[in-house]
Regions:
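Active-site core of metal-dependent hydrolases
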Residues: 189-200, 204-235
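N-terminal hydrophobic targeting/anchoring segments and the immediately downstream early-domain regions
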Residues: 22-208
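N-terminal secretory signal peptides that target proteins for export/translocation
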Residues: 1-6
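Short, intrinsically disordered, low-complexity terminal segments
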Residues: 7, 18, 35-36
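Bacterial N-terminal signal peptides
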Residues: 10-20
């Protein structure tokens, strides 16, 4: 059922059949398609999917951003050639977009950590600028699930924040709480490169690992994320 909330109108029809079949049991209580299900026309199927889509809170859990698109003259109130904009959210019936604070992996030293932190803060600030200065009447940052429900009920779009790569934390564990305060609600410990917290999938080809899994501070980071309520992204 959860999968149905991110269906787009361009989804192939065979996928719509699969998603609806998985999402709703038939009258016998089984999720197996019945003869009546098979007889459903394409138009009926799309109508049923749209009914589900409009009934639930829909979300996209990963929308990459470029901070150049968060200025007074160029921003998400316009229909830019980007993954997500406010007009696209309106047209597509998308309620919640998770904007991503992404940082590519760099050297594991103080200079690398500080450059990564500056990059992350620039992206946090851009998201807050959109919601608090550029279009506060159209979108608001949610910090809790209750915020999401309230904002949607008020007729606005919802911004949430995910952090792709914990590299900007450096060795300063206080930054995890800083990122939580800024709205970060999920974070991956590494991304396409070994970080100070954990190994990455990039070591699988030649078995070149840095930590053998989590590092010692990786365990500490997980404990702190659990304390604060930050989901651990292991995708």
């Amino acid at each position: 059922m959860v999968k149905s909330v991110i269906i787009k109108l361009v989804t192939p029809v065979w996928m719509l059949f699969l998603l609806v079949a998985c999402g709703e049991p038939n009258q016998s209580g089984s999720s197996e398609p019945s003869q009546s299900d098979a007889a459903e026309t394409e138009e009926q199927l799309i109508a049923r999917v749209n009914t589900i889509h409009h009934r639930v809170i829909t979300l996209d859990t990963h929308a990459d951003i470029n901070t150049e698109n968060f200025t007074a003259t160029r921003n998400y109130t316009q229909d830019l050639d980007t993954q997500v904009t406010l007009p696209k959210m309106q047209t597509g019936g998308l309620d919640v977009a998770w904007f991503i604070v992404y940082t590519g992996q760099g050297p594991l030293n103080s200079e690398g950590y500080e450059a990564a932190y500056a990059n992350a803060i620039d992206k946090f600030d851009a998201i807050h600028r959109l919601a608090e200065e550029i279009a506060p009447d159209q979108i608001e940052i949610a910090y809790t699930s209750d915020d999401v429900r309230r904002i949607v009920a008020e007729g606005k779009k919802v911004a949430m924040i995910g952090i792709e790569n914990a590299y900007p934390i450096g060795l300063n564990m206080d930054r995890i709480e800083d990122f939580h305060t800024r709205g970060g609600r999920y974070m991956s410990l590494a991304h396409n490169g070994h970080s100070q917290f954990s190994d990455s999938n990039t070591g699988e080809l030649d078995m070149d690992y840095l930590h053998g899994g989590l590092s010692e501070i990786g365990y500490q980071a997980i404990a702190e994320m659990n304390r604060l309520g930050i989901m651990i992204d292991i995708s």
